[in-house]
Amino acid sequence: MNERVLRVLDFKSVTEMLKGQAETALGKERAKITKPLSSLDKINMLQDETDEAAKIIRLNQAIPLGGITDIRASVKRSSIGGILSTDECLDVANTLYGSRNVKNTIENMEELDIPILKELVEHITPIRELEQAIKSCIDDHGHIMDGASSQLRSIRSSIRTLESRIREKLENYTRSNSKMLSDAIITIRNDRYVLPVKQEYRGAIGGIVHDQSASGQTLFMEPKAVVDINNSLHESKSKEQLEIERILKDLSNQVASYEQDLLENVKVLTNIDFIYARGKLAQAMKASRPKMNDEGYMKMQQARHPMIPIDEVVANDIEFGREYTSIVITGPNTGGKTVTLKLVGLCTLMAQSGLQVPALDGCEMPVFDEVFADIGDEQSIEQNLSTFSSHMTNIVDIMKKITDRSLVLFDELGSGTDPQEGAALAMAILDEVISKQARVIATTHYPELKAYGYNREQVVNASVEFNVETLKPTYRLLIGVPGRSNAFDISTRLGLERATIERAKSLIGVDSKSVENMIASLEKSHLEAEQDYEQAHDVLLESEKLRNALEHEWNLFEQKKEKLYKKAEEKAEKAIQKAREEAETIVSEMRQMKDSAGLKEHEWIEARKMLDEAKPNLTKNGNQKQVDPKPVEDRQLQPGDEIKLLTVNQMGEVLERVSDKEYLVQVGIMKVKVKRKDLELIRKPKKKQVDPVTTIKGSNYHVSTELDLRGERYEDAILRLEKYVDDVLLAGYPKASIIHGKGTGALRKGVQEFVGRHPRIKGARPGESGEGGSGVTVIQLG
């Protein structure tokens, strides 16, 4: 895209707004050099990125970009052996933390469909070891900490001891020789502790003079008693500086070893901040994503000039590129024609830069190889040209470059010369541009061009509405209606005599009168059409409102139905839970039998399987499967009768009558109390001895040796873990693995606390490298 059009349309103002939305220096730098592209695929990719950022903002979420700085120069300097300062090292650590934070935040936005951003953060490499190495040596204020090395800790301990000894001796001087001192304080000169001694007591104190006051009355002396200690202190501070340099050298070498990863992280973070800034700008402008095309078709509803405040700007509908490829906006000067011209140009540049445009949803924007604009008189002064020559020089250059993939914007085409010649020249230029199949919008105040729009199929007239009552333009664009001067109406409103107005009208040609009357009629028809449209729009809104109300009622019905299903499911689950609770005591007995009486393992597992098979089968809607209940009379049921338990569709046998409405029946190995209405008599077999059975609390027959708790809430995870440990104990496994992930460590800590207090868990250890490392805890069962 040519630089001149970016300057003429003031595209820099847009990039400055974008720069203001970026949060890092890296993002601001990238925003500043934003340029329009001409590849449809690349533009669509940019629009996809912007749309993902806008989606995050719409859902009140955010990407945290705090603490991220431009560390590229520091990283490159470390790679050639340079020693970084403490602040530079701290910037590296903070940027590493910021990159890790950005990566985790975007990866955890599981409910959002943001594939581009999620793919981007896959290229961020967290370097915890380097981050921690720097943070363990340098505090948040950029100071090397004592714990940076054992040597530094020892040196600083020695320094503190020596400083204490020096202060103690000098404080003795201040107490015993206060009359010899200008002030009873201890100060420092040339990195040596000294006392402010009066000139006349120089010999009495004795020592080395390091400085004197401006008047010469006070000497800053180092008493002989502290010279040796000061020497030792100076030596220790030199050692301290050498050790600090060694530590910084070591940290710089570590930074250099991760050069490629760090530079890649910075590159990704820059792009993410740039994308996020585009999303925030879209929100600030109340913009929407344009559907891009390479057909030269533009359609914007309620489009707004991006540089005019939202509460002041007038929105307009603009569409061209199919039925007509050119728009000629006619009418008087100062009517807002140039604003419309720049609006189209700026929105085009924004869309091709991956920015959303300030218009309603559903807008469509074409992709142009070039946008050309002849607006204003920017060349005339600096090149000492007339207005006409300035415009024509630029137009000649444009005419040489335009193609069928160009957008051309002419402001006051043909102005600055004789009106008749200027109008003819304007029409000839438009014919040439249209013949090259370029898209063009031109503004003019020449009345001759009004007829031009009617005589060309590919051209449509337009005007900017003028309010005769207020004598001000409304800035509303009227497509299909050419502009008129309104001179007579304005003069009448301003008080010009009626006779003078009529005399003026009589002096203009018949053709001009006809054209003006036609335009007035068109304006009236256009206004009536708009009113009809608004009425139809109101009816449509009312219909949509009614439809929404019906949808709401339907949703309420669906919710009520779902609640009924849930109640049925809860009722069924309560029945299951009751049976399980009755089995709990027997489970305990069977555990004792297994430990003491040697219950066979296959019998134990078979019993558990049978109990699970007895669980009522629920459909996905939450209600029980339908059965055909056939209640039987009391006289039909006797101990030993073969029956069907209707609630679970299982065969069983009556053991005894508990009450008028309840029986004890055996289903498989399970004995349960069942209401009479839930039983169906099958037949009365021969009497047989019923072996005693035991019920147990069921679990799935196949119990996995691993339990994956990643992504679970803490409370839910512990409940699942408790049940799982019971299951693997019942299955007789010697060990099992609990997968909790590394994360923040909260879940891992909870798992370890549970394992530590469980009486049947003999021990636990972290997983080995092949087992998942610290993200897994392996438990030993007994």
Swiss-Prot record:
The keyword DNA-binding applies. GO terms for biological process: mismatch repair; negative regulation of DNA recombination; rescue of stalled ribosome. GO terms for molecular function: ATP binding; ATP hydrolysis activity; ATP-dependent DNA damage sensor activity; endonuclease activity; mismatched DNA binding; ribosomal large subunit binding; rRNA binding. InterPro entries: DNA_mismatch_repair_MutS_C (IPR000432), DNA_mismatch_repair_MutS_core (IPR007696), DNA_mismatch_repair_MutS_sf (IPR036187), MSSS (IPR046893), MutS (IPR045076), MutS2 (IPR005747), P-loop_NTPase (IPR027417), Smr_dom (IPR002625). ATP binds at residues 331-338. It is an enzyme of class 3 (hydrolase). Keywords: ATP-binding, DNA-binding, Endonuclease, Hydrolase, Nuclease, Nucleotide-binding, RNA-binding, rRNA-binding. Residues 707-782 form the Smr domain. The keyword ATP-binding applies. NCBIfam families: mutS2. Homodimer. Binds to stalled ribosomes, contacting rRNA. Endonuclease that is involved in the suppression of homologous recombination and thus may have a key role in the control of bacterial genetic diversity. Acts as a ribosome collision sensor, splitting the ribosome into its 2 subunits. Detects stalled/collided 70S ribosomes which it binds and splits by an ATP-hydrolysis driven conformational change. Acts upstream of the ribosome quality control system (RQC), a ribosome-associated complex that mediates the extraction of incompletely synthesized nascent chains from stalled ribosomes and their subsequent degradation. Probably generates substrates for RQC. Belongs to the DNA mismatch repair MutS family. MutS2 subfamily. This is Endonuclease MutS2.
